[in-house]
Structures are given as C-alpha cells and as structure tokens.
C-alpha cells in the first residue's frame, strides 16, 4: 500500500513537470488532439485484447484441448502470419481508403475473430482454430497500420518523435494490461 502511495505522489510530480517542459519525455500535450487521443486509446485496447488472447490461448490449447507444446506453437502461428500479410496490404490501402474506414474494418474483423475464439470447445477442429486465429491476425493487421498512421500524422510534424514514443508506450501499456488481466 505504501508503494502505491509513493507511486501516486511521484507519478503526479512527474506528469506536472512534463507538462511544463518544451520537449517533454512524455508528450501528454499531444493527447489534447482528439484524433490522436482516440487512436492511442484504441491502440491500448487492441493490444490489451491481443495479449489476453495470446497469453491465455496456450493454456487453453494444452490444458483443455490436450495439444502438445509443439502443436500449440504451430496452432498459434497463423495469427502473426495473417498480420504479416495484411499489415503491408493495409499500408498500401491506407493511401486509397480513409484510415478510419480501413481501421474500422480491421477492428471489426479482429473483434469477430476474438469472439469466435471464445466459442472454442473441446470438439473444435484444428482447421476451426486456425481460421479463427487467422481472422484475428488479419483484423489486427488491417487495424494497426491505419491506426499507427493516424497517430503519427495527427501530431504536428515537429512532434513526430514524441508521437512515435506515445505509439510505443500505448503498445507496451496494452500488452502489459492484457498480460496482467490473464494473470488475474
């Protein structure tokens, strides 16, 4: 409890000090830009959801479905492969389709994929698992690329370094939240 109190005091001091710096280490002033703030929050949420799935799935696949460690690893592979394929495609499309539309399509696919993962049962086939994971990965790739582009482009050009730092912080914060939620 004492540690949390110290964290609150030091955190408050740090944030107030950063707000008065010309080149802050933590550029909180960028959160005053509505589209930047929304994109950062959706990035945090998407990485939280991703880690919830990616950390909990190995336990489910091994303990509930009885797959070996090797098979579990192979079953999880379609997600990053689908992301690997769709993220560059989204980079190409973001120049032709509004990032909000493309990101919304990606987020919708990601949510459908996550929901479909929640319907897995002991009778689910390997093909069914792979298709669900591919849907998650494809949606994630279609969402992240336009969202990242929006984050960087919504900040003033001279602040692109700070925006990039906030992008990395959002990713790590989301991954940390997701992993922590699995542990609870």
PLM segments and residue spans:
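12-transmembrane solute porter fold
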Residues: 3-6, 10, 22-184
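Phenylalanine-glycine-rich, low-complexity intrinsically disordered regions
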Residues: 1-2, 15-20
